[in-house]
C-alpha cells in the first residue's frame, strides 16, 4: 500500500493512501494516519471520493481525541462542498449524529 499510495494521481494511489491511513488509525496510530491524510490534502488528488473519505477519517481521528468541535468543522465543510451521489453523505450524517449535532 505504501508504494501504491505515493501516486495520488491514480484512483489506486488515492484509495491506497486512504486505506493506509485507515489501517494506521485502526491500529492506534492516529499520528501517522493524520500525517498521511495531511500529505494527501497538500499534494491533492483528482479523485474526490477518496479525498472525502480522508476528511471523514480526519473527523474520526478528532472524535477519538474528544475534539468534537474540529470534527464537526470537517464534516460540515464536507457536507457543504461535496455533491456526489454516493455513500459520503450518509457517513457525514452518521458522524454528526454520533457527536450530537
Language-model features: locations:
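Acidic, polar-rich low-complexity tracts and alpha-helical solenoid repeat scaffolds
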Residues: 1-101
Amino acid at each position: 500500500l505504501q508504494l501504491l499510495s505515493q501516486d495520488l494521481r491514480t484512483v489506486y494511489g488515492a484509495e491506497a493512501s486512504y486505506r493506509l491511513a485507515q489501517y494506521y488509525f485502526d491500529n492506534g496510530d492516529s499520528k501517522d494516519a493524520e500525517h498521511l491524510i495531511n500529505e494527501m490534502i497538500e499534494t491533492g488528488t483528482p479523485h474526490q471520493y477518496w479525498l472525502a473519505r480522508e476528511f471523514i477519517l480526519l473527523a474520526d481521528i478528532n472524535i477519538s481525541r474528544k475534539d468534537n468541535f474540529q470534527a464537526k468543522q470537517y464534516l460540515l465543510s464536507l457536507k457543504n462542498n461535496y455533491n456526489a451521489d454516493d455513500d459520503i453523505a450518509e457517513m457525514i450524517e452518521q458522524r454528526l449524529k454520533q457527536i450530537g449535532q
